[in-house]
Amino acid sequence: MATVSMRDMLKAGVHFGHQTRYWNPKMKPFIFGARNKVHIINLEKTVPMFNEALAELNKIVSRKGKILFVGTKRAASEAVKDAALSCDQFFVNHRWLGGMLTNWKTVRQSIKRLKDLETQSQDGTFDKLTKKEALMRTRELEKLENSLGGIKDMGGLPDALFVIDADHEHIAIKEANNLGIPVFAIVDTNSDPDGVDFVIPGNDDAIRAVTLYLGAVAATVREGRSQDLASQAEESFVEAE
């Protein structure tokens, strides 16, 4: 199973927290000390916590679970999308719209509209419209794709959230908490770990660190999915006999 070593984390700068004046005292158990007024995260804690989170994500996916990757700040946005797509999962990487989970019924209607517009743009409907109407629909399509494109094929609520930056994505975490959906999150020294079921103390800004987390999670998910497919194949083989 995919795991991440202390050396990988050091190389990626996972141990660099935020400036000491911005700290959240709830993160004290995970802080090793401070250097040049910057908190240093204790990787002796992070390594096992991250690997435990990976094992749990693997379990969820091997039971056909769906993972929603969430990272809407600019530095993480592209990497979040790439990681989710690389393991056939789902993502929100621009803006978290309030109610995305807790008001799924309404979100589902918006997804239906997005799919209708996609069909119209491909089957020649747009060509039959006035220039102004076609432009308006194209803009609507782009806007919906931007906010819902990563979840349009999710088909229901996810089974877990993997979040980059617990502080930035606190609304998503709160919604998941309300629905009992487990939250796995990268929590930096300035963030509140409350509401996160699997806390991964680490730098949430450095792109190398973010890429490291996402790469490991995507690899774990791919492994979990192949276990699921293998057990499905075994079942159908037994039935065929």
From Swiss-Prot:
GO terms for biological process: translation. The keyword Transit peptide does not apply. Keywords: Ribonucleoprotein, Ribosomal protein. The keyword Ribosomal protein applies. Transmembrane segments: none annotated. GO terms for molecular function: structural constituent of ribosome. InterPro entries: Ribosomal_uS2 (IPR001865), Ribosomal_uS2_bac/mit/plastid (IPR005706), Ribosomal_uS2_CS (IPR018130), Ribosomal_uS2_flav_dom_sf (IPR023591). Belongs to the universal ribosomal protein uS2 family. This is Small ribosomal subunit protein uS2. It comes from Shigella flexneri.
